[in-house]
Amino acid sequence: MVDKRESYTKEDLLASGRGELFGAKGPQLPAPNMLMMDRVVKMTETGGNFDKGYVEAELDINPDLWFFGCHFIGDPVMPGCLGLDAMWQLVGFYLGWLGGEGKGRALGVGEVKFTGQVLPTAKKVTYRIHFKRIVNRRLIMGLADGEVLVDGRLIYTAHDLKVGLFQDTSAF
């Protein structure tokens, strides 16, 4: 039985990375440094732009985060692909929250737009995931749109984020 809370702490997210939150067969979040959120502040089975589920999570920004030291030297900026990966992470986390089992894999995205950046001077990144569809057959898959905001300003949008849960990834 999945503990379906509306919010999760950093320790909860780390427990997910160790395979402890959604059980031995549930999907896992990545461990640091690839875990791209500090907390989930809201999860619902309704709501969002399509009233089919919503997730909101946050990442605290500080100049010591690992990517600022290498991307780019003298011009530090969070790689846009990390924000995209965070959205995929949250789609997979939601599938586990719904009780889905398997190993999460990003399956694609229809369109991504970057209209801003995350600099070391920022305070907080907010991720918003609006679910469009959940497929619960042999393959469990989530389809969602996502947004990334920095200090309240929209900087990335993604349409048709897809994540699947697989029982066997050997042929993937």
UniProtKB/Swiss-Prot annotation:
Q: Gene3D superfamilies attached here?
A: Hotdog Thioesterase (3.10.129.10)
One Pfam family of this protein, by short name?
FabA
Enzyme Commission numbers on file: 4.2.1.59, 5.3.3.14
Q: Which GO terms describe its biological process?
A: unsaturated fatty acid biosynthetic process
Tell where it localizes: Cytoplasm
Which GO cellular component terms are attached? cytoplasm
Concerning CDD domains, the annotation shows:
FabA
Record InterPro entries: FabA (IPR010083), FabA_FabZ (IPR013114), HotDog_dom_sf (IPR029069)
Keywords annotated in UniProt: Cytoplasm, Fatty acid biosynthesis, Fatty acid metabolism, Isomerase, Lipid biosynthesis, Lipid metabolism, Lyase
Q: How does it assemble?
A: Homodimer.
State its role. Necessary for the introduction of cis unsaturation into fatty acids. Catalyzes the dehydration of (3R)-3-hydroxydecanoyl-ACP to E-(2)-decenoyl-ACP and then its isomerization to Z-(3)-decenoyl-ACP. Can catalyze the dehydratase reaction for beta-hydroxyacyl-ACPs with saturated chain lengths up to 16:0, being most active on intermediate chain length.
Q: What is this protein called?
A: 3-hydroxydecanoyl-[acyl-carrier-protein] dehydratase
Query: Organism source for this protein?
Result: Salmonella arizonae (strain ATCC BAA-731 / CDC346-86 / RSK2980)
Q: What is the lineage of its organism?
A: Bacteria, Pseudomonadati, Pseudomonadota, Gammaproteobacteria, Enterobacterales
